[in-house]
A protein has these predicted regions:
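Cytosolic ends of transmembrane helices, especially the final helix of ABC transmembrane type-1 domains
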Residues: 216, 240, 254, 288-315
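Hydrophobic alpha-helical transmembrane segments of ABC transporter permease domains
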Residues: 28, 32, 36-40, 53, ...
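Transmembrane helix-loop-helix hairpins at lipid-water interfaces of multipass membrane proteins
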Residues: 23-79, 155-160, 271-275
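ABC-type nucleotide-binding domain
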Residues: 331-576
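Short intracellular "coupling" helices and adjacent cytoplasmic loop segments at the cytosolic face
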Residues: 2, 83, 89, 97-121, ...
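An intracellular "coupling" helix at the cytosolic face of ABC transporter transmembrane type-1 domains
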Residues: 14-20, 108-109, 125-137, 141, ...
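Membrane-integrated ABC transporters
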Residues: 1-37, 52-62, 80-84, 88, ...
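Small-residue-enriched core segments of transmembrane alpha-helices in multipass membrane transport
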Residues: 165-179, 280-288
Length: 576
């Protein structure tokens, strides 16, 4: 555990080292607090002794001293709390940002394989425990140093009482250690269960509309009830274990307190211990009897800290959470040419979606992909954006292998407008600024005009400052897609991918969007996935996909002649 703890504290220090002077001041405050904790009972005992001897003048001076000690203790407690909060806040913020950045760099296959709860719990709960480690150590260091001072004072007063306290510490320490080991194992299971429940609740909240429309409330609530019962059962099991040990240990404390009182009475009756020193020991006993708790709680929290650190290490360093890999080649400008050269890919090893797929796209051209669902149209877009990596073959942008290009050369030059675009829970203006923070109001207005969104925005009381809700919940499907199109126009990337982006639009708006796409042809390389063939008949080329291959490539008129599958789809659409 020591080796693991050393590694984890070194990791936490990376995020706390800028607050090192506050940490030093916190340790100094702790040191003074220890002195006060040891001295205060001595002064209190003297007050009682002097009062019993009617030495009122000395009592007055001692009372003033005790008052000053208490004031000093309050000030030091305040400073300790202040420094602790600053250190925690700064460490927590930096750690969360760093972990958030790491999560954004994970491969999509890793995101797909884990529930959102895995990342939410670690990003919130585990980071909090790591950020608080130095405050925990300092807090318990205060207790431990105070206990050492108290035990030293008791040793000077009477070695027999000291020996008794050591025996008491060993017995309670053994029980505390057993409790920590049992609770830590149960906590591992509880955290995993909590991740599963958090992920399911996230799905429930995001899919609440579909759940209502499908009348699936009962099924979801039944599943939620089952998972919550399982979680609460594990939570209760861990809590019961803690209570059982607390009952045993608390009862032992009471027995030990009774024994120490009997022991002191015996020593006083034999004139081997003065009443004044007995009062001092009694004042110390409240701390001394629970001395082992400080060490045990420190050990328990450090084990929790190690557990949280290891869970975060899994995301940052473990091969179980693979990161996206980019090359070092940077393109200052992208023309928009790209090529798929014998590319194969599957979301799992058993089944390939694309099989030796090859095609070339020239810059400033409009290419459409057509085919049945599941033939790999969206997969082509995902591979081009490097959301996934091909199993075999190469993807080239302007003649450079995508594996050699850096992140900016790919992601800053390709925009995908999906069938269900995610709209952030901010204003319309801020949604557009997400992709380009220095965008001007004129650019925003122009992008919304091209995307046929300007009339709708003008009808809103707050206009561009209207907050659209999580996922754009206050917008219709068509409005969300048009906002996504405006967002792509603001970004001004050279390659724009439309993945069924006009599927939720009415015919009038679809015509306007089609005109907007036609206006963009001279400046952009445009790729379109569409089931409505009427939206892509003016494309420069149409690629018909089947079973992971391109089986036909040409204009609309050419495909009607050479591709029976395309002709059949087009005739079926005309009949509708």
């Amino acid at each position: 555990m020591i080796k693991e703890l050393k590694k984890n504290i070194k990791f936490a220090w990376k995020y706390s080292k800028e607050e090192k002077w506050k940490l030093i001041l916190l340790v100094l405050c702790t040191f003074f607090h220890v002195i006060i904790s040891v001295v205060a009972p001595l002064v209190s005992a003297q007050v009682i002794v002097k009062l019993s001897n009617n030495q009122l003048k000395q009592v007055f001076y001692l009372a003033i001293a005790l008052f000053a000690i208490n004031i000093g203790s309050n000030i030091i407690n305040y400073l300790c709390g202040y420094f602790s909060q600053v250190i925690y806040r700064e460490t927590f913020t930096k750690l969360q940002l760093d972990l958030g950045k790491t999560i954004l760099r994970l491969r999509n296959s890793c995101i797909d394989a884990n529930s959102s709860g895995v990342f939410i719990e670690r990003l919130t709960g585990d980071t909090s425990k790591i950020a608080d480690v130095f405050n925990i150590i300092n807090y318990h260091l205060l207790d431990i140093l105070t206990d050492i001072g108290i035990f030293g004072a008791v040793f000077i007063i009477d070695i027999r009482i000291f020996a008794y306290l050591i025996l008491m510490v060993l017995i309670i320490g053994f029980l505390e250690r057993r409790k920590i080991n049992v609770v830590t194992e149960k906590d591992k299971v509880l955290r995993k269960e909590n991740e599963n429940v958090s992920g399911f609740i996230g799905e429930l909240v995001r899919g609440v509309r579909d759940i209502k429309m499908l009348s699936a409330e009962r099924s979801f609530l039944t599943t939620l009830r089952t998972r919550l019962i399982s979680l609460n059962k594990k939570r209760y099991d861990m809590s019961r274990t803690q209570r059982d040990y607390q009952l045993i240990i608390g009862s032992l404390h009471d027995v030990f307190d009774l024994i120490i009182i009997v022991l002191m009475l015996y020593l006083i009756s034999n004139n081997e211990l003065s009443i004044a020193l007995a009062l001092v020991v009694h004042n110390y006993m409240g701390r001394a009897s629970y001395a082992v708790n400080s060490y045990s709680h420190l050990l328990e929290q450090l084990k929790n800290f190690n557990l949280s650190a290891n869970r975060i290490f899994e995301i940052i360093y473990s091969s179980e959470f693979p990161k996206e890999k980019f090359g070092k080649h940077h393109l200052d400008s992208v023309e928009g040419n790209f090529e798929f050269r014998k590319v194969s890919f599957g979301y799992n090893e058993e089944e390939l979606v694309l099989k030796d797929l090859s095609f070339i796209v020239n810059s400033q051209s409009t290419i459409a992909f057509v085919g049945k669902s599941g033939v790999g149209k969206t997969t082509i877009f995902n591979l081009l954006c490097k959301m996934y990596e091909p199993s075999n073959g190469k993807i080239l942008i302007d003649g450079i292998d995508i594996m050699e290009l850096d992140r900016e050369s790919i992601r800053d030059n390709i925009t995908i407008i999906s069938q269900n675009p995610y709209i952030f829970n901010v204003s319309i203006r801020d949604n557009l600024k997400m992709v380009k923070d220095d965008v001007t109001d004129e650019e925003i207005v122009e992008a919304c005009r091209i995307a046929c969104l300007d009339d709708f925005i003008a009808s809103l009381p707050s206009g561009y400052d209207t907050v659209v809700g999580e996922g754009g919940i206050s917008l219709s499907g068509g409005q969300r897609q048009r906002l996504a199109i405006a967002r792509a126009l603001v970004q001004k990337t050279k390659i724009i991918l439309f993945d069924e982006a006009t599927s939720a639009l009415d015919n009038i708006t679809q015509t306007k969007i089609q005109q907007a796409i036609d206006n963009m042809k001279e400046d952009y390389t445009i790729l379109i996935i569409a089931h409505r063939l009427s939206t892509i008949i003016n494309s420069d080329r149409i690629l018909f996909l089947s079973d992971g291959h391109v089986i036909a490539d040409g204009t609309h008129e050419e495909l009607l002649k050479i591709c029976p599958e395309y002709r059949k789809l087009y005739e079926a659409e005309i009949e509708k």
